[in-house]
């Protein structure tokens, strides 16, 4: 286990396990409390009503932090690899990081502004998180191909691009169907006119969310051979 998490591998590993736990625990508590229907609630539905709202908010906030830490570490890894063997313009890597961090900010917004309390802000945060997150995975997949075979195996590149493609394919109907729903609510009746839009949107939302989780899982091997150091200097003038 310790060998598996050598180097900086513990960062994406913690992100994956913590985020998975956040989704699952919030869902279980919300269902057992009778606050949501067990069949395909939105992820945000499982974090709207106390006590699950507190669990969801706390855990997703920390997931956003871990996501930012993982993305920044990945940025530094690619930067160092590119210095050793040039394969991509540094701007491409920087744009990817910027979009990823914006997505993490969106996660923070989702965690702190519940969908029934401030739906406009919540939905805006969700849009940032999902769209920027999907574009981030796509850009990182392209970078992986550019660095192949020096820094990534072709299999890893294919897996990352496959996850990115599925996420891209899911995020479009997720947004489209969600925009067609006329009311924000936690419980749905199959006979309601917007029910099909809710189901399609919820399926796509869960697909994209766990797509992110599986994508970051592919970073673990890359992070195993990496060490980050913080350098401290004291200025004698002060």
Curated annotation (Swiss-Prot):
TM ranges: 9-29, 53-73, 91-111, 116-136, 161-181, 200-220
Domain of life of the source: Eukaryota
BP terms from Gene Ontology: apoptotic process; autophagy; cellular response to oxygen-glucose deprivation; regulation of autophagy
Subcellular localization, as worded in the UniProt entry: Lysosome membrane
Main location: membrane
Cellular component aspect of the GO annotation: lysosomal membrane
InterPro entries attached to this UniProt entry: DRAM/TMEM150_Autophagy_Mod (IPR050911), Frag1/DRAM/Sfk1 (IPR019402)
The keyword Cytoplasm is assigned to this record: no
Record's bilayer topology term: Multi-pass membrane protein
UniProt KW keywords: Apoptosis, Autophagy, Lysosome, Membrane, Transmembrane, Transmembrane helix
Keyword Transmembrane helix attributed: yes
Function in brief: Lysosomal modulator of autophagy that plays a central role in p53/TP53-mediated apoptosis. Not involved in p73/TP73-mediated autophagy.
Family of this protein: Belongs to the DRAM/TMEM150 family.
UniProt name for this protein: DNA damage-regulated autophagy modulator protein 1
Record organism: Mus musculus
Lineage: Eukaryota, Metazoa, Chordata, Craniata, Vertebrata
Gene name per UniProt: Dram1
